[in-house]
Amino acid sequence: MLGFGRRRLFSALLQVQKRPCQPSRNMRLVQFQAPHLEEPHLGLESGVGGGVVDLNAFDSTLPKTMVQFLEQGETTLSVARRALATQLPVIPRSQVTFLAPVTRPDKVICVGLNYADHCQEQNVRVPKSPIIFSKFSSSIVGPYDEIILPPESKEVDWEVEMAVVIGKKGKHIKATDVMAHVAGFTVAHDVSARDWQMRNGKQWLLGKTFDTFCPLGPALVTKDTIADPHNLKICCRVNGEVVQSSNTNQMVFKTEYLIAWVSQFVTLYPGDLLLTGTPPGVGMFRKPPVFLKKGDEVQCEIEELGVIINKVV
């Protein structure tokens, strides 16, 4: 399994100790903070669980948010590729705080019942077309941030998901053209208040969009890095126990179909997120049902993408 990293609090160090190191050949874009920086920067994660190369230090003309970086397309990606090929100082992982790789996107689009084995555990039919809902972008937090249990809910559940990050604006995108509009992939946790999914006329939004209900990260792994995003192991652990374990090959509707479908209705913008559904093993379908409680630790992991670890408070 992939190695696990943990969020580090800011230290009292006055200067960041850096060591030269060749970054990973795979492009793993991150947003991060460090004690010596006045504001968040963009960086390259030096492999899963590795330190960070500061892209803004490499080229001060680069934007400092991922959405702006993606909006500039090939211009900024070419700079990141140059940095990837250069031996640059790496800030140790212990000295950085990872933010969500994308913050405040225009849209967070989600897909329900998109794993065949998840449909089986509910004894429901596989959908004939995608079931689309959303989360507000205010629900996004970093890969090692805390999940806050809202006092309004007693049934907060886990859902590991692969998220697709849009890299190019598009509307009415053909399935054959979809990947030209995709920047890459990341790990998402679609935290869900089941009781609120069943209220409010059974509109799912309120149950999905409490603050901190969308941990994301640790990196935006560019599409050229992943040989087949629809053949990746995906799992979730609660307090070390595996509760979800499947493969993205179980998706009913793959990335190309989903984005083509959604783009019929809305224009997609750089930084938009598409959460592609969760596999079986969620708490509400256990007998008896199990829900998250204070003190729990949830690890969501996807092969090649990494792991996010969030404590419940």
Curated annotation (Swiss-Prot):
What are this entry's molecular-function GO terms?
metal ion binding; oxaloacetate tautomerase activity
What is the organism field in this record?
Answer: Mus musculus
Q: Name one GO cellular component term.
A: mitochondrion
Q: Which domain of life is it from?
A: Eukaryota
PTM-bearing positions, type Phosphoserine: S129
> What EC number(s) has UniProt assigned to this enzyme?
5.3.2.2
Catalytic activity as recorded in UniProt:
oxaloacetate = enol-oxaloacetate
Location, primary (coarse class): mitochondrion
Residue positions where N6-succinyllysine is found in the record: K202
Annotated residues that bind Mg(2+) are located at E159, E161, D190
Cellular location(s): Mitochondrion
By what name is this protein known? Oxaloacetate tautomerase Fahd2a, mitochondrial
**Required cofactors, per record?**
Mg(2+); Mn(2+)
Q: Where is the transit peptide?
A: 1-84
Where in this protein does the record say N6-acetyllysine is found? Answer: K202, K233
Q: Sorted alphabetically, which InterPro entries does this protein's record hold?
A: FAH, Fumarylacetoacetase-like_C, Fumarylacetoacetase_C_sf
